[in-house]
Amino acid sequence: MAKAKEGIGTDWQAFSNIEADNNVAALAVLGYRHAWENANVFLGVRNVNEDFFTSDATSLFVNSSCGIFPTIAASYPIANYPFSGLTVYFDVSRNGWTFRNSLYNGVGYNGWRRHDNPFLVRPKEDGVFNISQLEYSHRDGHYFAGVAVHSRQFAVDEEGELLTESPAAETSCAWWAYGEQPLWKTEEKSISVMAQYSENTCHSNACSRYGEVGCVYQDSRNACGLSGQYALFQQGREYSVEMTWRRQLTRSLDVQPCCQYVTNADGDFFVVCARLCYDF
């Protein structure tokens, strides 16, 4: 991924991961996985986006908060895209229920240097980060609840800047609940609604509260979505609205334009972007 030197907008949630720093050959997943009939175990390099915070509805939207809650992503420098870290992960499924758990190094990395690579394990300096999630699926509805615990605290000021270079050796956590449910469904078409909410127990962290509601229409070749988001940062409140449409052009090629309106203490922003997806 590459981008220009100047950012596109000054929104706080990050309207898209395209705003991430330039990366060349950053390692996302590398490790050993063992699978049983109802369980999986993974040991190696991994990031949180591989296993958490994604669903049929949220994966349509471009805003970064639909990929991971800002109460976590903005508050902790964890193995969240474009960073990864050493991980012990497992999941167990039974009768519509799934439990997932991952234990990570407290800070994620994406370099190839001695002191900047995803193979580092430094609990004394970086702390440890654990994330657990319980899921339930029933009649095409999906429901999630989880908690993330970090053994370090990364407090920021009202400008969103870290108060100290070294994190405090204090434990804090974030919790969330999320659900999506079809309202109408035929053999090829469906309309679903979704809602999610999250809080961070430490109000000195970058983001302490987040919520979103939205709806998605899908058929054999189209997916359209509308969502509204709210996030409480140290700098203030941010509100955003996203409209997006994904169109399947061929069996392997999709195009997806997107419009977002964002308002916060820094101003009002309107962003238009598009992504091209190729499956092979």
Roles of regions detected by a PLM:
Residues 1-106, 205-212, 223-233:
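Outer membrane beta-barrel
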Residues 5-10, 54-60, 110-118, 154-163, ...:
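Outer-membrane beta-barrel translocator domains and adjoining extracellular loop/strand segments
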Residues 30, 88, 132-134, 177-179, ...:
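Membrane-embedded beta-strands of outer-membrane beta-barrel proteins
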Residues 35-38, 92-96, 136-140, 183-187, ...:
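Outer-membrane beta-barrel strand-turn architecture
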Residues 91-154:
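Loop-centered beta-sheet repeat module
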Residues 99-102, 137-232, 243:
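Detector for outer-membrane/organellar transmembrane beta-barrel domains
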Residues 268-280:
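Outer-membrane beta-barrel "beta-signal"
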